[in-house]
Amino acid sequence: MYKQQSAIGKIIVIFLLILFTINGVVFATSDPVIDKDKTLDISAIDAFMTKEIDRLHIPGASLAIVKENQVEYLQGYGVSKPDGTKMTPQTPIVIGSVSKSFTALAIMQLVEQGKLHLDDTVSSILPTFQLANKEEAKKITILHLLNHTSGLSTYDGQLAISNGDQTLQEHVKTLATIKLASPVGSQYEYSNLNYNLLGAVIEEVTNTSYKEYVEEHIFKPLAMHNSYADPKDDRNNTSATGYQTVFGFKMPTKQLIHRGTVSSGYLLSSAEDMANYMIAQLNNGHFNGKNILSPNAMNKLHHPFAFIGDSTYYAMGWEVKNAIISHNGWTENTYSKVLLDKEYGISLQINAMDYFNLNEYDAIVNGLHQLVHQEQPSLSNSKPFLKYILFDLLLAIIIALIVRSIYRLFNRKKPKVTTFQLAFQWFSLAVFNLLLPSFVLIAFPQLFGPLSTVTLFAPGIGHLLFIIPVSLLIIGLITLVQYLLKKPIFASRLPGNN
């Protein structure tokens, strides 16, 4: 058993190192919408998308490309549902944190109307808003929330995702015990809580629901007919089914209810609608003869404010790097990204999420950006599925060894060992069955995030990242007791051991 413990420990170490290192053909399925004066190489774009979707085993995707104030290309790829329904530019998909740009836009509309000021404190608008440190909470302003400089933590924002089945106002009341991760205004730290609070601010100031405000003041003026703040409003059930990656296989899953986090990550929109949204963003708030925001306010919305790193800044619902404005978003089973430069806008939506290959999804948008500027895209030859084959193999071996170790806990046979072997057994027990699993369990939130969120976003592997160290620790504790008692605890329970 002790040799098995050593083997398990070594495999766990290898597994964790690999984990930290990794951070069927699908064709276009709808008739493309193309601007007659296009300069895009549509065949190259379709070939690139088809290759990437096939390589990454993506069920379906929708693409929108605009240039200045014109739609250049709309296309759907693959399927939107398990029954084979085709993905189209009109298919709504949950857009994740791209929702933050809509919330920021709504806030700036209220600022322009004089109903709100960026330096207003949150507590002056939301009477129920409190944190563990009440005095610090009173310092947080609307601008702090927009720029992610409130001091609220990434961890607490992640935790809120799995507890979203409540109204925005109810969600605000749950923050009373939360501690700030840093002093208000001192540094950037991305947190969904900031935009959940902004959603509640919109409701308080307008005396209407976030859903109703966004529909009336953003979706309608921009002719976004397949966009929703509540999935129940999709009465024709055209929204795409999301897929999660479970041990490397894409599985259709149903999202949790996210009423309390809709303003930070759970709006739905289609490629066609996102094209209109991008046109407004590229044209100082102007779309089809209407202004949803003044040029000055739109400039503030895009202005780099909080330094993130690597020449990247956070504005209001957008990241800014070298004059490129973008934001990605992912939920438990969808992905989206919008990228805007001074000329083009690109929106990619995918009805799947692969937490361990997220960078591959981001790279698709980067490749599309190169293509629209007549550049060769940076192509990846990696096979993400092979990573999962390795993961699955390692996990299978670890689980098999754990099962064998559990079985041997019931075996009281004690082979003779040398002093060196005994010392190694103690070392193996201490490191691989006590110290290492204890460290992983204690540091789990810092290493991976809240357990509820990890298991939600990375089912299967996320569960095992917790179950394996717990199992090792239990085996280690039982083995330690057996050492001290000098006899197997469970041996007498086995047939033939009486």
Name each model feature, range by range.
Residues 2-32, 68:
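Hydrophobic secretory-pathway targeting helix
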Residues 34-95, 131, 176-177, 234:
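Short, conserved catalytic-motif segment at the N-terminal edge
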Residues 40, 44-51, 97, 102, ...:
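Extracytoplasmic/secreted proteins, especially bacterial periplasmic and envelope-associated proteins
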Residues 70-71, 115, 249, 344:
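Residue-level signal for well-ordered, solvent-exposed loop/turn and beta-edge residues enriched
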Residues 73-75, 122, 130, 152-153:
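Juxtacatalytic substrate-recognition/specificity segment
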